[in-house]
Each structure stands twice: as C-alpha cells, then as structure tokens.
C-alpha cells in the first residue's frame, strides 16, 4: 500500500515524478482525478470521488500525490486518512517565488502564491490534525525528491 503526499506549491512534485517515475509507482491525483469546475474552483460534488479514487490508487501505487488545497486536506482529515504534507519554511518565500518565475508559472498564480505564502505556512504550522504528518522543508534547495524521509521510503521499496 502506498503513501499519500500533499505538497505545497513549488515543493517539487513534478520534479519528483520526472526523477522517480520509472523507479516506483506514482499516481498523481492532482493531474488524474477531476476535482474542479471549468472556472477552477473545487467542486464539492467531486470531492468524495476524489478521496475514494485516491484511496483506491494507494493499492496499486507507492506514492499518491493529492491536491494541496485546504478543502482536499480537510476532506482527508475529516475521514481520518493519513497523509504526509511537505511545505517550506517562511524564510524560503523568495526562493519559491523565484522558482515559479523561472518555471514560467502564470503571473496571477505567482501573485497568489506571493500574497498567501506566509498565511498558508502559518495555517499548516497551526494544524494539529493527528493524521497529517508535516514535514517542513527549511533548507534552501530542499524539496520532496531530496528529503531523507522520501529517500528512505524509496529504498525500503527496493527491498
């Protein structure tokens, strides 16, 4: 059974899939399961299906990535579903903004990240949910794909 991972914007989900996609089974619910309306807002009618399909995907995958939004995380929390959450320290805001500019993210998305970065990190820090295992990426250049926790997990799959 695989683990469920939620990652803050810019924590390296796409990079991780590119590097490890041929070594382990990765399912990306963010890309694979419909969750939003045409206008980009989360559709509450799709949320139950999203959670159920994500849980089913853990049976055939080593890692399942889920959406970072509070709505999705709250749905997992309400159902007491364990997941790992990777997020940066507030001190890394400029690094994350710069990386999004380099990646050529849409300007409005960069503005949203810039405007909400500290608030989102504070919300995660304040979250006391028992089934959310938080991993703060405090060091410059530290992302999902190079954290010891994930590396140990990947190594354990090979055994």
Residue ranges: model-predicted function:
Residues 3-5, 25-27, 84-86, 133-137:
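Hydrophobic/aromatic beta-strand patches that form the interior of the parallel beta-sheet core
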Residues 6-9, 66-70, 88, 137-141:
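Structural motif
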Residues 22-84:
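Conserved nucleotide-sensing/catalytic segment adjacent to the nucleotide-binding pocket
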Residues 42-45, 108, 112, 145-148:
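Alpha-helix boundary/N-cap detector
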Residues 79-129:
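A glycine- and Lys/Arg-enriched "phosphate-lid" helix/loop adjacent to the NTP-binding pocket
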